[in-house]
């Protein structure tokens, strides 16, 4: 069968892709990728993903989101409400262009968010963007490092129905709470080196799994730039862990992605 893979979480607007994005996307097409869901981490990337979607219509699909960690110079800081408020009108303005709200979520890694105040601010920003997703009737593309339980509980409390938890690394019991809520989980090529993640992949039903690269990060070799064409590594690893064919993983995860990101069908 012809390959039809969907990368549900990649960072095409990252500086690492500035010089050769055309070749990167050509290699993705040659690898059988049929659609790319391009997330953002900050407002400076919004225009980039919109332009990429216009240059590659029907192939690159943009998302808008404010990541829980924000750059300030060469450092990262835990997101604050004032990082989000000035740009909220952009979500409405581009509601017809974007396919999801993301990358949003929570990151309680101690060296970034070690105070209750920082964590509370992250939760406020997360909730506000979840509310935007409900207003726009869009799914969410979610980051949940060291915060899996709170992330899933917050989404459930707000009645979120359509969500992708990318590069999920929480406990299997927490993942199953997300499965019961109807959420999806995606895994990048880097998980092929992680036995703990294999246990998680075994437990999550294939009907709740999508593929991602998180490129340019989270490739098999952390010293080499990852790119969307490597998504087959994720596909083959999930197949190996579950003891099924990569064709089945490809078919089911693509259907899952089309269900979750309904605008990919149009």
Regions found by a protein language model. Name each.
Residues 1-266:
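Mid-domain alpha/beta scaffold segments of enzyme catalytic cores
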């Amino acid at each position: 069968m012809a390959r039809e893979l969907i990368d549900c979480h990649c960072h095409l607007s990252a500086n690492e892709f500035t010089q050769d994005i055309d070749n990167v996307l050509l290699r993705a097409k040659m690898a059988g990728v049929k659609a790319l869901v391009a997330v953002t981490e900050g407002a400076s990337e919004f225009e980039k993903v919109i332009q990429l979607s216009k240059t590659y219509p029907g192939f690159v699909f943009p998302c808008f989101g404010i990541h829980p960690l924000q750059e300030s110079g060469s450092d990262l800081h835990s997101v604050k409400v004032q990082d989000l408020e000035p740009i909220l009108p952009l979500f409405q303005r581009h509601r017809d262009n974007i396919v999801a709200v993301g990358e949003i979520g929570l990151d309680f890694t101690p060296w970034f968010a070690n105070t209750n105040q920082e964590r509370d601010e992250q939760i406020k920003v997360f909730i506000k963007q979840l509310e935007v997703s409900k207003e726009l009737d869009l799914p969410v593309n979610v980051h949940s490092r060291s915060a899996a339980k709170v992330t899933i509980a917050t989404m459930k409390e707000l009645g979120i129905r359509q969500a992708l938890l990318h590069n999920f690394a929480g406990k299997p019991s927490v993942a199953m709470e997300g499965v019961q809520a109807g959420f999806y989980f995606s895994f990048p090529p880097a998980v092929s080196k992680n036995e703990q993640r294999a246990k998680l992949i075994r437990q999550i039903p294939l009907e709740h799994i999508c593929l991602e690269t998180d490129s340019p990060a989270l490739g098999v070799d952390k010293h080499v730039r990852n790119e969307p064409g490597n998504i087959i590594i994720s596909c083959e690893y999930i197949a190996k862990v579950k003891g099924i064919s990569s064709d089945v993983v490809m078919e089911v995860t693509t259907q899952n992605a089309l269900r979750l990101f309904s605008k990919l069908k149009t």
